[in-house]
Amino acid sequence: MRVKRGLAAHRRHKKYLDMAKGYRGGRSRLYRTAREAVERSLCYAFRDRKVKKREFRKLWILRINAAARLNGLSYSKFMHGLTLAGVELNRKVLADLAVREKDDFAKIAELAKSKLN
């Protein structure tokens, strides 16, 4: 008996076309174009999940540096002072304090400054 693969092909095509919903023009309607667009987008998504971590760390360091300089310390001296003081706050929390709780950040900066001298 002859096996017809229409159902499998239809499901495969449908899978890519569903993933390409919202794309413009043929990228959402033509199977081959949609497949290429989806595969490329998945590559970008994979890559950018890694890039996101780097970008956020960069942003946190930038914010901590700006706040530390307002308190008379460079970023590296501030972080070294925190290490000497035994403060184990991560960069994400420090950056959040620098933006939202300036007074608390100033106290932490004073602690770091006192441990440096």
Curated annotation (Swiss-Prot):
Keywords assigned: Ribonucleoprotein, Ribosomal protein, RNA-binding, rRNA-binding
Gene3D superfamilies given in the database record: 6.10.160.10, Ribosomal protein L20 (1.10.1900.20)
GO CC aspect terms: ribonucleoprotein complex; ribosome
One GO MF term attached to the UniProt entry: structural constituent of ribosome
Pfam families assigned to the protein according to its UniProt record, in alphabetical order: Ribosomal_L20
SUPFAM superfamilies registered for this protein in UniProt: Ribosomal protein L20
Keyword RNA-binding among UniProt keywords: yes
Entry's family note: Belongs to the bacterial ribosomal protein bL20 family.
NCBIfam families hit by this protein: rplT_bact
Name of the molecule in the record: Large ribosomal subunit protein bL20
Source species of the chain: Nitratidesulfovibrio vulgaris (strain ATCC 29579 / DSM 644 / CCUG 34227 / NCIMB 8303 / VKM B-1760 / Hildenborough)
Taxonomy of the source species: Bacteria, Pseudomonadati, Thermodesulfobacteriota, Desulfovibrionia, Desulfovibrionales
Name of the gene: rplT
